[in-house]
UniProtKB/Swiss-Prot annotation:
Superkingdom as given in the UniProt entry: Bacteria
Similarity remark: Belongs to the class II aldolase/RraA-like family.
Cofactor(s) this protein cannot do without: a divalent metal cation
Enzyme class at the top of the EC tree: lyase
Enzyme Commission number(s) of this protein: 4.1.3.17, 4.1.1.112
Natural source organism: Halalkalibacterium halodurans (strain ATCC BAA-125 / DSM 18197 / FERM 7344 / JCM 9153 / C-125) (Bacillus halodurans)
Name this polypeptide is given: Putative 4-hydroxy-4-methyl-2-oxoglutarate aldolase
Residue sites binding substrate per the record: G87, D88, F89, V90, R109
Length: 210
């Protein structure tokens, strides 16, 4: 990515995923079962997509080898949590390579060590069993992750509330809408802060719109 591209996508770090979701009418949010391993995990970056067969992660290693710094590895493991797509060894290599984070529609393992990496990891679950490496899988292809279609280069944004996807080409429009939603939310919160009358007026307006 160019410095201009990095500066642009960095703006999404200051906006909650809830506001980005609202800007996209909630249509591109991954299933709520895909959660951050650490509550403070946050990830923003273009998707480097991976499609794997159940219990096989060689394609993940290929994607890491080809990834550019700042990419988010997004893995369609079809929700299978019987075998881990990655553990602390693979995740540690990804961090060293400058990969921005992992989003896995499946499981990881080595939880304590993985948490200690301070590397953004979003996954459906955890398990003990390792994956095989038979080579079955595809990289940089359209996938479905967490019930949402994702194409290579789509912008991935994740925080404590979950993960959402901004389709490539819509980033600027979504950024402006999300910024406005964030500003409106903050103004509304300031207006009612410790103000019983303002709260009652707001509730009245919502319950009995004119």
């Amino acid at each position: 990515m160019s410095q201009a591209e990095i500066d642009f996508i960095t703006q999404f770090r200051t906006i909650p995923t809830t506001c980005i979701s609202d800007a996209l009418d909630g249509l591109t949010n991954l299933t709520s079962t895909i959660k951050p391993l650490n509550e403070n995990d946050q990830v923003v970056g273009p998707a480097r997509t991976v499609q794997v067969a159940s219990g096989d992660n060689l394609a993940v290693l290929k994607a890491m080898y080809e990834a550019s710094p700042g990419d988010v590895i997004v893995i369609d493991a079809k929700g299978d949590c019987t075998r881990a797509i990655a553990g602390d060894f693979v995740l540690g290599m990804a961090k060293t390579l400058g990969i921005a984070g992992f989003v896995v529609d499946g499981a990881i393992r080595d939880i304590r060590a993985s948490k200690a990496l301070n590397f953004p990891i979003f996954c459906r679950g955890t398990t003990i069993a390792a994956s095989k490496k038979t080579g079955i899988g595809n990289i940089n292809v359209p996938i479905s992750c967490g019930g949402v279609p994702i194409r290579p280069g789509d912008l991935i944004v994740g925080d404590a509330d979950g993960v959402t996807v901004i389709p490539k080409g819509q980033e600027e429009n979504v950024l402006q809408k999300a910024k406005k939603k964030q500003a409106d939310d903050e103004a509304r919160e300031r207006a009612i802060s410790d103000n019983v009358m303002a709260i009652r007026a707001y509730l009245e307006k919502m319950i009995h719109p004119s």
